[in-house]
Regions:
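PGST-rich, cysteine-poor low-complexity/disordered linker and tail segments that act as flexible spacers
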Residues: 145-147, 239-302
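Conserved catalytic core of nucleotide-sugar-dependent glycosyltransferases
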Residues: 100, 117-138, 312, 329-333, ...
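A short beta-strand element within beta-rich, extracytoplasmic domains
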Residues: 155-168, 222-225
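Active-site-proximal specificity loops/subdomain of glycosyltransferases
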Residues: 86, 91-122, 289-350, 424
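Extracellular and analogous surface-interaction loops
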Residues: 146-156, 167, 210-217, 451
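N-terminal signal-anchor transmembrane helix specifying type II single-pass membrane topology
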Residues: 1-39, 61-64, 70
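C-terminal catalytic/acceptor-binding lobe
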Residues: 4-6, 10-18, 280-291, 408, ...
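Aromatic- and Gly/Pro-enriched, solvent-exposed loop/edge beta-strand patches characteristic
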Residues: 98, 108-123, 169-256
Length: 536
């Protein structure tokens, strides 16, 4: 018996040691469909030690320099801090996949959609819409009809046109056709059709020339046909006309059956005529298409090198969570939801702080404020809210349309949860699927803190929550469903400014972040220092 015990003791000790090491080891930093994070969800007792705060830093794959600056400034200070180092877990949030399409070949720099132009129609005029030969041209009941489109490669519109009634002899109508740039109230140009001035007949349309402008890539416009008579227009559903996109240089934007119309739509969605256009800079387009295969190969090689660098970086620092998304701006909300899932499934924590890799963060100040203000309750959202109660838009340096605050709104704390922020229908912050003209209140993305129960709710509903154009506005829309207690705090700065006692400040270069932290360490104030020759 003793012999058996002697043999068993090493096995028991080995198993105990293995279990102890397993419990102490950090969870794998990977948030993907059926990866280790999902396996850990089955064994919550194997989570790593408890943290007061988990910090998630949104970071792009190629932002190595910004991450290294953070590691050498506030993160280094945190790791060396005698008490905070054991209370905080910091992870960079990075998409596991790079976009396989080079930036030059994407529809826009914010997504990963291929600019799919093939066999472009060059050096000739193109009719945007045409009717099949066997289509009758009866009058509808609609007196105002509009269609929206997006330009994917520069074009010039030369003429606007209207369908005509085959039963009429000549042109017997009074119709106005206008082209608007999206979100603009004044038409770029107008064509007026009447019996004495009906233009030129081409196929089943009457056309009139207009002043010629180059419509650049990413231009979004709406053509509106309006009958000046009591009769409706000769119009067709978009599915009953042929769209001639010139090989892919433009795309018609439709709301889709059963969906709400876009805000800039007028009247009924459809086509009551057309326009003639030519493709601009055709030779440059052909050259670009010719060089695309070589560019795709080079880009694929660059992605492999980037993957290798990221694997090495993660191995060295062990502070990256790779989430299972393609790393583009449009996918940032999905990155955040995946990180919430990873956090819930692999860690034990009280609060979660979200920030970006171009932000100055003062974690000591964050902890001091948590203790001083008792900011640790349930269903809790601590950030910066800009309160606005009217709809007068203003343009910020960032180019985003905001809403001017009224005097009454400024009676709150130094604010910056953004409220009544206008929804952009074009550009980087374009949002076509949120029907309201303004977003619910949302916090500045430079930094905010949410309670554990909110993180659990977001993680549990990650598969159902719709993502919108930005992670900040998406967060506001998601939070509108649960109505958290908001603590408004202007020390989470929304713009690139420096204030004493600030908790965060965004949009800095690596060199600027280094300077801020050097001032902070030397004088206790990142904004100014008597011994330094200037500050921010």
């Amino acid at each position: 018996m003793r012999n058996w015990l002697v043999l068993l003791c090493p096995c028991v000790l080995g198993a105990a040691l293995h279990l102890w090491l397993r419990l102490r080891s950090p969870p794998p930093a990977r948030a993907s469909g059926a990866g280790p994070a999902d396996q850990l969800a089955l064994f919550p007792q194997w989570k790593s030690r408890h943290y007061d705060v988990v910090v998630g830093v949104l970071s792009a794959r190629n932002n190595h320099e910004l991450r290294n600056v953070i590691r050498s400034t506030w993160l280094k200070h945190l790791i060396q801090h005698p008490s905070l180092s054991q209370r905080v877990l910091v992870k960079f949030i990075i998409g596991a996949h790079g976009c396989a399409v080079p930036v030059e070949d994407r529809e826009d720099p914010y997504s990963c959609r291929l600019l799919n132009i093939t066999n472009p129609v060059l050096n000739q005029e193109i009719e945007a819409f045409s009717l099949p030969e066997d289509t009758s041209s009866g009058i509808s009941e609609d007196r105002v009809v509009s269609v929206s489109f997006r330009v994917l490669y520069p074009i010039v519109i030369t003429s606007l046109g209207v369908f005509y009634d085959a039963n009429d002899v000549g042109f017997q109508r009074n119709i106005t056709v206008k082209l608007y740039q999206a979100e603009q109230e004044e038409a770029l140009f107008v064509a007026r059709f009447s019996p004495p001035s009906c233009g030129v007949q081409v196929h089943k349309l009457w056309y009139k020339p207009v002043e010629q402008f180059i419509l650049p890539e990413s231009f979004e416009g709406t053509i509106v046909w309006e009958s000046q008579d009591l009769q409706g227009l000769v119009s067709r559903n978009l599915h009953k006309v042929t769209v001639n996109d010139g090989g892919g240089v433009l795309r018609v934007i439709t709301a889709g059956e059963g969906a709400l119309p876009h805000e800039f739509m007028e009247g009924v969605e459809g086509v009551a005529g057309g326009f003639i256009y030519i493709i601009q800079e055709g030779d440059a387009l052909l050259q670009n298409l010719h060089s695309r295969p070589r560019r795709l190969l080079d880009h694929r090689s660059n992605l492999h090198r980037e993957d290798a660098l990221l694997r090495e970086e993660s191995s060295v620092y062990d502070d990256i969570v790779f989430v299972d998304v393609v790393d583009t701006y449009r996918n940032v909300p999905a990155k955040l939801l995946n990180f919430y899932r990873w956090t819930v499934e692999t860690t034990s924590f009280d609060l979660l702080l979200k920030t970006d890799d171009d932000c100055y963060i003062d974690l000591e100040a964050v902890f001091n404020r948590i203790a001083h203000k008792n900011l640790d309750g349930p269903n809790f959202w601590w950030g910066n809210l800009v309160l606005c109660s009217d709809r007068k838009g203003v343009r910020l340096n960032s180019g985003r349309t905001a809403v001017a605050p009224t005097r009454s709104s400024q009676l709150f704390l130094t604010l910056s949860f953004r409220l009544n922020w206008a929804v952009d229908r074009t550009g980087k912050w374009q949002e076509l699927e949120y029907p309201s003209p303004a977003y619910p209140a949302f916090a500045c993305g430079s930094g905010y803190v949410i309670s554990r129960d909110i993180v659990h709710w977001l993680a549990g509903n990650a598969g159902r929550l719709k993502t919108y154009q930005g992670e900040d506005v998406s967060m506001g829309i998601w939070m509108a469903a649960i109505g958290p207690s908001r603590y408004q705090d202007g020390l989470w700065l929304c713009e690139k400014t420096c204030e004493p006692g600030m908790l965060s400040s965004p949009q800095y270069s690596p060199q600027e972040l280094t300077q801020l932290w050097q001032l902070k360490e030397r004088c206790g104030d990142p904004c100014r220092c008597e011994a330094a020759a200037g500050g921010f």
